[in-house]
Amino acid sequence: MRSHDDAAPDSRRGVGGGLTIRLARVHDHLDQQVPKGQWRVLVDRLWPRGIRKDRLELSDWDKDVAPSTALRKEFHSDHLSFEEFRVRYTAELDASGAGEQLLDRARSEDVDEVLLLIAAKDAEHNHGIVLREHLLGR
């Protein structure tokens, strides 16, 4: 999977308060320390399969910002198109306020960059893309 930093020209664009938000696969950050100035957060509801917890250094694991279990299962069973998933997941984020809470925690840590980590294999159709877009709109 390509890094999402390379996928979009605006991928390093910041949000209010100067935070840069990036998206990457968990597997690309195994056995690496969190760099100074970065807040590294796992945004999957489930721990990534096959990854020992001691191999992934995190600043946070935010299960609340992940899609609901029902929505995740419906999307992964191919009952929803990515666009339908995007609409429903965005509605969940709007209703819960979890995205804003994530940004508030990141800002309180006095960091420049938030790295959203996901385990998804599909680089083009995953909740991380929707979450990042949602956060950039805040």
Locations of the language-model features?
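Residues lining hydrophobic/aromatic ligand-binding pockets adjacent to catalytic sites
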Residues: 2-138
